[in-house]
Each structure stands twice: as C-alpha cells, then as structure tokens.
C-alpha cells in the first residue's frame, strides 16, 4: 500500500509513459479493493509507510542494498528515483491521508488472529461416507500382509493400534493419506521413492510403504515423530529419484490444483563471492577486478587481516579507498537476506484456496509457484507440508534393478535385497565404497577400516557418526576407542545403559539426547522436545546453553557426578543442528547397504547404473570406470553401431561379469535428440561415416563430437581420419546436389574426398583427446606417460603407499580429483589426487594452505612433498610443500576437480 501511496514510487513515474493509464487503473482498483476489505467485519486493516530496515543496526547496509536494487532496475530499462528516503512531511503522510485511521503505530494493537482449523488439510477419503481415519485404518489393515506375509507379530499389531489411536486423536489421518497418495502414484510410474527422517519411526508409514525401515524391529521411538505433548503436525520427508522428481511435482499441481498447492520459499543470503561482486558493481570497480576479488579474496573476507594479506599478494593497492570500502561493505552484507528462492521440495497443500490464506508468487521455472514464506513460517502457522525431495542414488538403484532383470533375470528392489550379507560387509570394511551412497566420502572411507561395520546397525552408526555434530561433541574418538576395546564401556546407571547401550555409552542420536534429558535430568517430554528444537536451530537461537543449568542440576539431583553431567551437556551442545535422528540414519543406511550390495555382487550393473545417473556423488566417470576395471569388469568404448544413449551391458569375455558398453551420453556436446536419431536409423548397422550422415539426419557438429570421442573405429577410421572425413560434409546441400537428390530418398555427400593416410595419433595424445571428448579414457592414464621423468625425481606412485614405512618423507604427483574443507576441520583442507596406480589422500594444514595457496587451488596436476601417516589400514600424506605441475600435461586438461562438495 505504501508503494501506491508514495508520489515518487516506481509506478508513479510510469504513468506518463505509453500504457500509463492502465497502471493508474490497476492502482485505483487495488486501493478500492483495500478500502472494501478495510470495512469488512473481523478484519484488521493496517496501512504502513515504506519499509526500509527491520533494525536500526543495519541502517549502514540500507543505502548499499538500495544501490544494488537500483543498478538491477536500471539494467532492465527503468530508473526510479534514488532519493526515495528523503521525503517531505506532506509526502510521508500521503498514505495516511488516503486511508484515514488505518495507520497502526503501536505494534501492541495488532493481535494474532486465530487460524481456522480444517482449511489446511486436503480431503483424502476414497469412499463416500467414510472418514479419513476409517480410510487410513482400512488401508493399513489391507497392507499388513504385504509387509508381513507370515503374519504381523503381536508387538507390531500393538504398535499399529497405538499409532492409529494417536493419529485419530490428533486428526492427522488426512496428512498420512495425502502422503500415501503421492507415494502410490510415484510408484505406479515406476519411480523409486522412500520416506526418511522421523517418519521412519512410524509403523503405519512402514506398513503403507512410505518408509522402508521396520521401526519395531529397529527399536525406533514413535513419539519422536508424533506425540500429544508436542502438539505439532507430523513432517514426512519423501525422497524420489532426482531426475524424475519434477514428474511428481507437476502431478501434485495437476491433482490438487494450482490454487491449492505451492512450494515454500527459502531466504537466500549474501555469501562472500556474491557480496564482493555486488558491492564492487555499486562502487564502480572494473568487472575484471571484481572477478579477481570474488575468486581470490572471498574465502578470507570475514577475516580483515587475512583479506588484506591476500589483496597484497594480488598486487592490489590497499590505499585505494574504494577497495577498502568494498571489503568493509561486503563484510557487512554477509548473511544478510538477498532474495527469495524455492525450497527444494517443501509442498504446502490445502483444502481452501491458497491465495486466500497466503501470498503467492511465480518462479523462474515454468509451471511452479511458491509461497513467499519459508518453512519455519509454515510450521508456525501449522499448514500441512509434504517434503518432495530428490535423491540421485534412488535413480541409480532403479536403473540397476532394471539391468539386473534384463541381463541376469533377477527381480530385485529395496525390500528384497538380502539382509546382513557378510561379503558386502567385508567389502565395506576395506573402504572399497567408491560410488556407494553416504559412505563414499574421504571422511567415511577413512573411518570404515576402524569402524569395521558388520551389521546393519553398525552401518546406521557409520552414517551418523561422520557428521559435524558427533565430531564437535567429541563423540567420535570415544566411540571408536570403545569399539576397538581400547577403552572400557561404563555406564553410571542402569538407566543410561538402556539408553546408550547400542552406542557403547556415547550419545550419537537426537533421540538419545531426549531420553537422557527425560530419564536422567528430570525433563518432561515437552521440555526434552524443546531441547531437541534448540539443538536443531542453534544458529538462530544460540544453541542449548539456556538448558545447561536445568540439565546439569537435574542430573546432579539424580545422583550423577558433576564431571559426567558437564561432559554430557558438552556433548549435547556439540550436536548443534547436526545431531542426527536415528530414524534418518537408518533410512540412509538402508540405501547405503543396497548400493554396497549391488557394487559387491554386480559391479558391472552398478558401474553402468552409476554412469547413467551422472552427475551425482563425489566421483567423476573416470574414477567410476577405473574402479569397475579394478573389480574385473570389462569396459568397452563408445561405438556408433553398438552404443545406445545410456551405458549398457553386453556379454563379457571372462564369463563372470557382463561388459559395460559406454553410451552416447558420455560424448560431450552430443544432444539427447541426436543420439536418439542415430539409434533410430541404425537398422541395419552403419557402414561408413558417409552412411551415418545420409541416414541419421543429424548435424555435422554431432558427427564431429562422435569422431572426437573415437566412435567410428568400427569403420577402421581412428579419430584423425574420421575428423578428416567429416570435413567434407555439410548440414545443407549445395543447389546442384539438392536438385540431384529430389528423386532420391537420401542426400549425396557434397564432396568426395580422395583417400589419404593420416599419421597415427600418439598414445599420449589419444588419451588426452579421450578425456577432452568424454571425460575418461580406456587407453591409459595421463600420469603414466610422465612416470619415467617422475621416477627420476624420486616421486613414488600412489599405489606404493601401503608398502612404505609410516613417517617416511615422500614425494607424490597426481591429478587433483577433489578438494574438501569441512567446517569441523578448523580450516584444514583434504585433497585427493590420482595417478595410474590409484589415489592418495592429502592433509593440508592451514599454514601450508596460505603458503601454497595458488598451486593448491589452481593445479590440475599437483606435486607434493609430505610425511606418510598410517593408522591401521588408513593412509594419509601430511603435506609440507606443494608445486603446480600442470604444464607437464602440455595444455591438456584431463578432468576438472570436484571441489568442496
């Protein structure tokens, strides 16, 4: 309203422009509707002046934010006045005069309006006259035989009856029916999905097929999901295949109607790179300079001294007032709200029209709309929200199950995978987990040889323990020492034994923290839930510190020692927002186990499925293929007559595994449609490049991409010869040949080149071209061609590290696969490099990072000197110095590192 009432507002300046009368009509119409609403009983009208900041403390940022907005508007062809904040008294009161009496000054006069129950949950009954609770009960009873073919155990039936009673008393049945409807539809389309989070605590969700973890067998607590004390609606997160999630989202819009369905918003905040770029534009810095600042200074922006040091390294003039002001203002903007984004999958569904309840806005993606409030606002208002999330590994598993059925005639799904397979666990204990879900990261691979998971619950702990929460709470090392029998497991009381027995006396899960607070410190269930919420929102609320006295004093009153009480609080405080719910860890552990089982028993299937699911995970296709080859899988190159779009399986030579045929999807620059055209016209097989050009009707550029990927070897033409042949082709025929083609079913080539013999490409050049065209090579490794020179320098191979003495000083050189800097590592960076024999894990301390910053961040081929560090089967190299050896690649860039994932 303030925008309409302000004479110098943007719409006002547009009135004299063509079409300005329409702006006046729209404004008048909006004000008239507001006047009608103002007179409606039971409505509280409010008129405000222009809103600038929420707090006086951010007034320094307000001009810079206004300037950023102004630049954006000017770029779009409109120049509003920049002096909107300097208004006369008459202008400031114009809004008040327009609606006399509507300006509310004291905030105490505005009372919270009660929400109208029943407007927020869609009706999901399937039969006339049947209530939602009756429908839910009927569906659960009908689904029981599918989950328990031999009959449900008595404890399961008791738990289901308890849950249904609680769901009915809280009127949550429509919510369960809505989620069940969405999951059933997704599965009817062949989309793999699985609920996770606290929903895995529910036997009702398990029986309906929403989740895949049996909570009764796993001992999960239903009250972590729903309880009468919490009085808040349940929250069910459902993961769908990432590349098919949009199908589910659009079906929800169609099924419930766009007037009843919308996604939540997220508040996107200024990060260092964006803050430097935007402030640099406002202050008129050259674009190349702002690019340099965002690239080299952003990571140190929060530290003024380090920021100046890096600017000096770049040769920047620190006496330049604009430069120092850029750093200062960008630092002020860090964490400040920038714009609204779209929540990854938080769907709000209502019975009434959404636009009568909440403000809506369209998104940049066609076919979507969002509510301009975030998920926390939605939770407070008690709207029904379903999280429709994407998980790439589910798509990978679905593709793997399809290949298992096609190639090995084995039907498999998540529920049918053999449980507690010893061979799978032996593979996991060796950290042979590249490509698997959740346990493939550097940190997980380092932990697996120490944890040695041998049961599913071990895997649940493995998923949960390599998290910032347990690390910050100093829970990891005590647990590992107790697991390795290096430290005795003691329990100060039998109560704690019952709570922490499964995790050897160390609280690893949120549920355990709640139970410790209830049973050992005298918290009520409601207070324990407040503790859980405090742990989940520590960034906004300041953590669990307000609960310290109550927790410690409560434990002292129950006979626990002061030291133990303080230690317990410190561990819970360390959880922060990263304390993992046990149910969430169990859901992820199931997918981790399924992916590890497939990799162990069908590495050919797993490799093909993983390649067809890219991009996802930590590792590039090159590492996935090399890992499959180490497991005895034959990988065959892209072939114009044998490849399909996806990677496929063919009869292998060794009889044990099928061979993986790389698909057209691996060819950089080749469109899916062109790949489909090549396959559709391939009956019978192509006989030459000219034959492909005639029959497939794809652009010459597509043929060039295939030639660069060496896909025409079946014709006896290697990469250079194929590229030479394609030079004689064109997308559009010349008039003479076009006239000759009118009586033919196919065009003639424009130029018939004489046969020539081109020199063969060297093996090294061929490998480099493979990487450039497909991101991998089956013909060798780039570092292998440098090995002779590296050996003379005393550089060892990555594959030799297990056989070298602990503490020895060594030199290594390899391609950089990834760089990681976890928030819990106190600035330490972890780098993985690779040569022709394997990988090596580097630890780069903070002081070494600063000294060798450029080679560390810019190198594709990195050389290091360091000290070998061994702890059991875990091997690292602690870096002492670094050198950029990228020039040895002679201009070739084999692959791009997957940094900071």
Swiss-Prot record:
<dbReference type="GO" id="GO:0008408">
    <property type="term" value="F:3'-5' exonuclease activity"/>
</dbReference>
<dbReference type="InterPro" id="IPR004365">
    <property type="entry name" value="NA-bd_OB_tRNA"/>
</dbReference>
<dbReference type="Pfam" id="PF01336">
    <property type="entry name" value="tRNA_anti-codon"/>
</dbReference>
<dbReference type="Pfam" id="PF14579">
    <property type="entry name" value="HHH_6"/>
</dbReference>
<keyword id="KW-0235">DNA replication</keyword>
<keyword id="KW-0239">DNA-directed DNA polymerase</keyword>
<keyword id="KW-0963">Cytoplasm</keyword>
<dbReference type="InterPro" id="IPR011708">
    <property type="entry name" value="DNA_pol3_alpha_NTPase_dom"/>
</dbReference>
<dbReference type="GO" id="GO:0003887">
    <property type="term" value="F:DNA-directed DNA polymerase activity"/>
</dbReference>
<keyword id="KW-0808">Transferase</keyword>
<dbReference type="Pfam" id="PF07733">
    <property type="entry name" value="DNA_pol3_alpha"/>
</dbReference>
<dbReference type="GO" id="GO:0006260">
    <property type="term" value="P:DNA replication"/>
</dbReference>
<dbReference type="GO" id="GO:0003676">
    <property type="term" value="F:nucleic acid binding"/>
</dbReference>
<protein>
    <recommendedName>
        <fullName>Error-prone DNA polymerase</fullName>
        <ecNumber>2.7.7.7</ecNumber>
    </recommendedName>
</protein>
<dbReference type="InterPro" id="IPR004805">
    <property type="entry name" value="DnaE2/DnaE/PolC"/>
</dbReference>
<dbReference type="InterPro" id="IPR040982">
    <property type="entry name" value="DNA_pol3_finger"/>
</dbReference>
<keyword id="KW-0227">DNA damage</keyword>
<dbReference type="GO" id="GO:0006281">
    <property type="term" value="P:DNA repair"/>
</dbReference>
<dbReference type="Pfam" id="PF17657">
    <property type="entry name" value="DNA_pol3_finger"/>
</dbReference>
<keyword id="KW-0548">Nucleotidyltransferase</keyword>
<comment type="similarity">
    <text>Belongs to the DNA polymerase type-C family. DnaE2 subfamily.</text>
</comment>
<keyword id="KW-0614">Plasmid</keyword>
<dbReference type="GO" id="GO:0005737">
    <property type="term" value="C:cytoplasm"/>
</dbReference>
<comment type="function">
    <text>DNA polymerase involved in damage-induced mutagenesis and translesion synthesis (TLS). It is not the major replicative DNA polymerase.</text>
</comment>
<dbReference type="InterPro" id="IPR029460">
    <property type="entry name" value="DNAPol_HHH"/>
</dbReference>
<keyword id="KW-0234">DNA repair</keyword>
